[in-house]
Curated annotation (Swiss-Prot):
<feature type="propeptide">
    <location>
        <begin position="98"/>
        <end position="101"/>
    </location>
</feature>
<feature type="cross-link" description="Glycyl lysine isopeptide (Lys-Gly) (interchain with G-Cter in SUMO1)">
    <location>
        <position position="25"/>
    </location>
</feature>
<comment type="function">
    <text>Ubiquitin-like protein that can be covalently attached to proteins as a monomer or a lysine-linked polymer. Covalent attachment via an isopeptide bond to its substrates requires prior activation by the E1 complex SAE1-SAE2 and linkage to the E2 enzyme UBE2I, and can be promoted by E3 ligases such as PIAS1-4, RANBP2 or CBX4. This post-translational modification on lysine residues of proteins plays a crucial role in a number of cellular processes such as nuclear transport, DNA replication and repair, mitosis and signal transduction.</text>
</comment>
<feature type="cross-link" description="Glycyl lysine isopeptide (Lys-Gly) (interchain with G-Cter in SUMO2)">
    <location>
        <position position="45"/>
    </location>
</feature>
<dbReference type="GO" id="GO:0060021">
    <property type="term" value="P:roof of mouth development"/>
</dbReference>
<keyword id="KW-0597">Phosphoprotein</keyword>
<feature type="domain" description="Ubiquitin-like">
    <location>
        <begin position="20"/>
        <end position="97"/>
    </location>
</feature>
<keyword id="KW-0472">Membrane</keyword>
<keyword id="KW-0007">Acetylation</keyword>
<dbReference type="GO" id="GO:0005886">
    <property type="term" value="C:plasma membrane"/>
</dbReference>
<feature type="cross-link" description="Glycyl lysine isopeptide (Lys-Gly) (interchain with G-Cter in SUMO2); alternate">
    <location>
        <position position="7"/>
    </location>
</feature>
<protein>
    <recommendedName>
        <fullName>Small ubiquitin-related modifier 1</fullName>
    </recommendedName>
</protein>
<keyword id="KW-1003">Cell membrane</keyword>
<feature type="modified residue" description="Phosphoserine">
    <location>
        <position position="32"/>
    </location>
</feature>
<feature type="cross-link" description="Glycyl lysine isopeptide (Lys-Gly) (interchain with G-Cter in SUMO2)">
    <location>
        <position position="16"/>
    </location>
</feature>
<feature type="modified residue" description="N-acetylserine">
    <location>
        <position position="2"/>
    </location>
</feature>
<dbReference type="GO" id="GO:0031965">
    <property type="term" value="C:nuclear membrane"/>
</dbReference>
Amino acid sequence: MSDQEAKPSTEDLGDKKEGEYIKLKVIGQDSSEIHFKVKMTTHLKKLKESYCQRQGVPMNSLRFLFEGQRIADNHTPKELGMEEEDVIEVYQEQTGGHSNV
């Protein structure tokens, strides 16, 4: 397959609308999965807000990673090279680095 976006074949035309959206899996530390369908050009802040709302936690208490890199609010799936069924990992944000013992 090539990455060229020349004239779409008839096969591609049927999938064109579907191609604007991708399904992403968001997996929490407890291995729970939530699936999201997002536009390739949507800022991932919307996905992060939606996930946090479903989990009932503030957005700043979690960090979202794609392929080991932190996802910024203004990133889009297109910018990050995301594809169908890609996985976003969610971890508790850790603050501090020492104990007071």
